[in-house]
Amino acid sequence: MATFMTEDFLLKNDIARTLYHKYAAPMPIYDFHCHLSPQEIADDRRFDNLGQIWLEGDHYKWRALRSAGVDESLITGKETSDYEKYMAWANTVPKTLGNPLYHWTHLELRRPFGITGTLFGPDTAESIWTQCNEKLATPAFSARGIMQQMNVRMVGTTDDPIDSLEYHRQIAADDSIDIEVAPSWRPDKVFKIELDGFVDYLRKLEAAADVSITRFDDLRQALTRRLDHFAACGCRASDHGIETLRFAPVPDDAQLDAILGKRLAGETLSELEIAQFTTAVLVWLGRQYAARGWVMQLHIGAIRNNNTRMFRLLGPDTGFDSIGDNNISWALSRLLDSMDVTNELPKTILYCLNPRDNEVLATMIGNFQGPGIAGKVQFGSGWWFNDQKDGMLRQLEQLSQMGLLSQFVGMLTDSRSFLSYTRHEYFRRILCNLLGQWAQDGEIPDDEAMLSRMVQDICFNNAQRYFTIK
């Protein structure tokens, strides 16, 4: 019987073990998409205790706690202490067997805390609390210290177009940090004209760009100024959260002005008008990214804020989102083609939340590849609810069957936690085991030089090349 979480965790044969320990594990981390706070990196935040760093803002864990029947006060309540929340988590973890949280929890205790051979639960919680808190009190366990321990080379944060990016500038000017922290442009509030807060957001954009916005060209000018600001701060990627993928042929500016004018006047837009405006903004932005050498990321298919009562209580991003089931193939094809037809499609990474769409994306990317850029259009790593063993395997296998796995830019944390870098380790173990199994079964050559190069490329090299502006 196998022992739980040894050094060879998830590695089922000698080929897999060699690929992981010799080639994957030593590679740096290029975490091109995350939700870390740039202020916490700039300030080199020190965490008071394990409960704070482990549970603060982690809606994956919050969902598990709620599923276990834990009172909300012990999840997000301001009236309860970090220790009380931590003990609620300790009592919940043994109930998460089969959920990736059980693996992640123990991987996070191994690295960076060095706790091995101990199962986390109510019986061990006090000892682990003491051991981890002692380490968190040292400089090596500050925000930057943890990133350095985990061999992080680059992180891409997620930032609104109106953000000042002051903390990114502060980090760039700080010679004491050798990790690149680049902003990523996230313009969701610009193209989602149907949202209640759209008009209020446009006023904030006006102030940030110093441009009055009454016509569509005014919006272009405001966005251009903010794009320039992001570029000056080292941005080279954008990200878009798309719940419903809409497409309509882009109308002329007179029609776009009329649509924007109606919205500013508080009038209700038709579904066609929403699609026309959304498409116009996304296509224009995509062309701007192409001109700047940026990567465009599309995260497609979440259904957000399902629980109205809890949304009113806690706001967004608190663990009440799930997988949507809208059809995406036609609209995605037309959206990408609208940029490609003028040879202005940027490097693009497509992510789907619904795994039924894996093959849609795996085949879609082959329609829009381009010369001189290996893997110009990518099928991104298993996202969110697919960020687990089966989800990662499905994505890797379907990409390999319908595209080129060797050109894949690999894993990202998509996380708000400084302890989530072990997700790269999790991914690397799964990748190496998959290749090792194929080689053992005679499906691919047992050629260490060939396989090791592929592993190192997927773990780091491909992403580093892909996100470099030439």
Curated annotation (Swiss-Prot):
Q: Which UniProt keywords apply?
A: Isomerase
Extent of the signal sequence: none
Q: In which pathway does it act?
A: Carbohydrate metabolism; pentose and glucuronate interconversion
Could you tell me the Gene Ontology terms of the biological process aspect for this record?
Answer: D-galacturonate catabolic process; D-glucuronate catabolic process
Instruction: Provide the top EC class.
Output: isomerase
EC code(s) of this entry: 5.3.1.12
Q: Which SUPFAM superfamilies match?
A: Metallo-dependent hydrolases
GO molecular-function annotation terms? glucuronate isomerase activity
Catalysis: reaction(s): D-glucuronate = D-fructuronate; aldehydo-D-galacturonate = keto-D-tagaturonate
**Statement: the UniProt record of this protein carries the keyword Acetylation:** no
Q: Name one Pfam family in it.
A: UxaC
Question: What PANTHER family does the annotation carry?
Answer: URONATE ISOMERASE
Write out the similarity annotation.
Belongs to the metallo-dependent hydrolases superfamily. Uronate isomerase family.
- What is the name of the protein in this document? Uronate isomerase
Name its species. Salmonella typhimurium (strain LT2 / SGSC1412 / ATCC 700720)
Q: What is the lineage of its organism?
A: Bacteria, Pseudomonadati, Pseudomonadota, Gammaproteobacteria, Enterobacterales
Gene name of this polypeptide: uxaC
